[in-house]
A protein has these predicted regions:
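Conserved ATP-binding/catalytic segment of the ANL
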Residues: 185, 405-409, 419-424, 428-484, ...
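Structural core segment of the AMP-binding/adenylate-forming
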Residues: 2, 80-155, 169
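Conserved AMP-binding/adenylate-forming core of the ANL superfamily
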Residues: 22-68, 76, 92-99, 148-156, ...
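Conserved pre-ATP/AMP-binding loop-to-beta segment of ANL
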Residues: 18-21, 153-184, 191, 214-220
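AMP-binding/adenylate-forming catalytic core of the ANL superfamily
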Residues: 110-112, 433, 438-439, 449, ...
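Conserved AMP-binding A3 loop
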Residues: 33-37, 180-206
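Conserved AMP-binding/adenylation subdomain of ANL enzymes
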Residues: 203-220, 227-340, 350
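Conserved ATP-binding loop and adjacent catalytic segment of the adenylate-forming AMP-binding
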Residues: 248-251, 328-333, 345-356, 361-410, ...
């Protein structure tokens, strides 16, 4: 295929893997299997049904639903009709957030689930351009402008029987550079931007992904990330389709928490070979594994820790595993049979690896999952690049790096003036390739600032080395840089991740310094572990003495990175926090301080807690036991 569209892509791989299972979904407590041929047939019916409802080529259709088969076939139906999908996050709770995206994209139809329908009904009176709301679930009564997906499929069947040629002409008229998707950014200080992704953006990125990550035919991927996110979109179902694999989705619960509880059950039942993950999920997986080990008693826990240390020492940074540590290999195999095989059984027993994205994955987590036999390979990308730029994989991985740059992609590291910096020096990551977006929808100014002479300026900071050609290291955001009073700059993510991953007493952390006299740390405490610590010391956590002790413990965790501490020298002392602002509220999706992949939105945090930041730069606020900190730990 030469520059295929998504339509060409689906037709090609359906012909190749016709009777293989592509979609897996739990219905009435039973997992159902939908083949490649059946998937395409349903996409054809939905696409023809949308045409029968009057959908024109190039029009936009918003899609708001939990992950399920109809999310996939719904999107494919939109694309077969020659239209553009506008995937929306189910985590958008504010009516204004949904309204902006639907109005800004000029959506003329909306596909949604029964669970998400109330959000749509609330804003529909303000959306006169929306002609039809298509509900994936059967309702007793449909309101104005609503219809069920079964009716769309019925209309599609009639349309194909009456004039199949018109439908075929429509989907064959789709060109590689036609828009396939408008993907909205999370947005930080302004309205989110609509990222315009073409058919060729998608198919090019799948080709690129295949150059670094391999999957076997009939492997299963359980998709636990939101399908509206570009990472799940491409690294998930389109890449799996290209290998003849299948995708399963987590059964939807009545609440978000119920859906989360379904994840471990779905993992055991679907026995995935690969999953996509983000750091927040990775930490939860590790926490659950270690809770299970602890429950087996001190002897098992001790053996587990010995096995873990041995495997981590043997694996080193993965690319250099073994070497003079080869004497550990027999122990690695022995402990794997005794300990880690049981851990993997909790993940279905067939897990080969995770692909980590969405945010930087701490190197200790990478070492951990490799040790237990389920490597979590860090990748890097952004929606504007559809999204994959590089990834580690079993054939080539370096812990701490973001992986090998995909094929047919140019990457350069530039300074603030746009000049290429020498190998080893940090600068902005700038990329060029067929996966780079067409631009931002109805925002030519932002497009011109982001894409210059065909090069996408990512806003991320990284470097390359001569020692490992073709690999990229990502170290943070240009916009996240701490800026000292004398203009020096530093990327804070390394310290933040190290502290939150390494300390049981710190749940979340953001460093701040915007040309201030010193750096401060905004810290969300883990109150449960702090209160347990107090009780172990014989101090009531509800007393003033308890409050002081808990704050002292948090300070001790930070001080471990200072001279004399166990982590001394890991990070420059000049950038370590001189004051702590302990916060009374966590960064959550509800207060919009994390995005759909659980990545903290730094700008929003700094705005939300602006008063606490200002207070930390006062004489009273700099003191650890200040009134606001004392109150926050209770």
């Amino acid at each position: 295929m030469n520059r295929p569209t998504i339509i060409d892509f689906v037709e090609h791989y359906t012909a190749k893997y016709a009777d293989h299972v592509f979609l897996r979904e739990k219905v009435n407590d039973e997992w159902t299997a939908t083949t490649y041929t059946q998937t395409r047939e349903q996409a054809h019916l939905i696409g023809a049904g949308l045409m029968a409802l009057g959908l024109k080529k190039g029009e936009r259709v918003a899609l708001l639903s939990q992950g399920r088969n109809l999310w996939v076939t719904g999107e494919l139906g939109i694309l077969y009709a020659g239209a553009v999908n506008v995937p929306l996050s189910i985590k958008l709770e504010e009516a204004s957030d949904l309204l902006f995206r639907i109005q800004h994209s000029d959506a003329v139809m909306i596909m949604t689930s029964e669970q998400q329908l109330p959000k749509i009904r609330k804003i529909l009176p303000q959306c006169p351009n929306v002609r039809q709301v298509i509900v994936f679930d059967t309702l007793e009564k449909y309101e104005d402008r609503e219809t069920g997906i079964d009716e769309v499929i019925r209309l599609g069947r009639e349309q194909l029987q009456k004039d199949h040629k018109a439908f075929e002409q429509r989907y064959k008229s789709v060109q590689p550079d036609d828009y396939a998707n408008i993907s909205y950014t999370s947005g930080t200080t302004a309205d989110p931007k609509g990222i315009l992704l073409t058919h060729r953006n998608y198919t090019a990125n799948v080709e690129q992904a295949r150059s670094v990550v391999g999957i076997d035919v009939d492997d299963v991927m359980l998709i636990i990330l939101p399908l509206d996110h570009c990472f799940a979109h491409v690294a998930g179902f389109y890449t799996m389709m290209s290998y003849g694999g299948s995708i399963a989705t987590v059964p939807v619960g009545k609440t978000a928490m119920a859906t989360l509880r379904n994840i471990p059950i779905a993992i055991r039942e679907t026995q995935p070979a690969v999953m996509l993950s983000v750091p927040a999920l990775a930490r939860n997986f590790r926490k659950n594994i270690e809770s299970g080990i602890k429950a087996k008693g001190p002897k098992v826990e001790k053996l587990y820790n010995i096995a873990l240390r041995n495997a981590i020492a043997y694996n080193k940074e993965y690319w250099n595993r073994g070497g003079w540590q080869c004497w550990r290999y027999p122990l690695v195999k022995l402990f794997d049979r005794l300990i880690f095989k049981a851990v993997r059984q909790g993940f279905g027993g067939k897990m080969k690896f995770f692909v980590g994205g969405g945010a930087l994955l701490d190197i200790e987590l990478q070492r951990y999952f490799c040790a237990v036999g389920m490597p979590m390979f860090q990748g890097y990308g952004l929606s504007e690049a559809t999204p994959i730029i590089c990834s580690n994989a079993g054939g080539a991985a370096i812990f701490g790096s973001s992986g090998r740059i995909v094929a047919n992609e140019e990457v350069k590291i530039c300074d603030s003036e746009g000049n290429i910096v020498p190998d080893g020096e940090r600068g902005e990551i700038v990329v060029r390739g067929e996966n780079v977006m067409a631009g931002y929808w109805k925002n030519p100014e932002a497009t011109e600032k982001t894409i210059i002479d065909g090069w996408l300026h990512t806003g991320d900071m990284g470097y390359v080395t001569k020692k490992h050609p073709g690999f990229l290291w990502v170290v943070g955001r240009f916009k996240s840089l701490l800026i000292s009073a004398d203009g020096e700059k530093y990327s804070p993510e390394g310290f933040e991740d190290s502290l939150t991953d390494g300390s049981p007493y710190v749940e979340q952390c953001i460093l701040h310094n915007n040309q201030n006299p010193y750096t401060i740390a905004l810290i969300v405490p883990n109150k449960d572990t702090l209160r347990d610590y107090c009780k172990q010391q014989g101090v009531d956590p509800n007393t003033e003495a308890g409050q002081r002790l808990m704050l002292d413990k948090i300070q001790a965790e930070v001080d471990a990175y200072k001279p004399g501490g166990k982590h001394a020298g890991v990070f420059p002392e000049a950038w370590l926090p001189k004051a702590l602002a302990v916060l009374p509220e966590a960064f959550t999706e509800q207060n919009h301080l994390v995005n759909s992949t659980m990545k903290v939105v730094r700008g929003k945090v700094e705005t939300y807690f602006a008063d606490r930041i200002d207070y930390a730069y006062t004489q009273e606020g700099k003191a650890l036991h200040n009134p606001k900190n004392m109150e926050a730990v209770l």
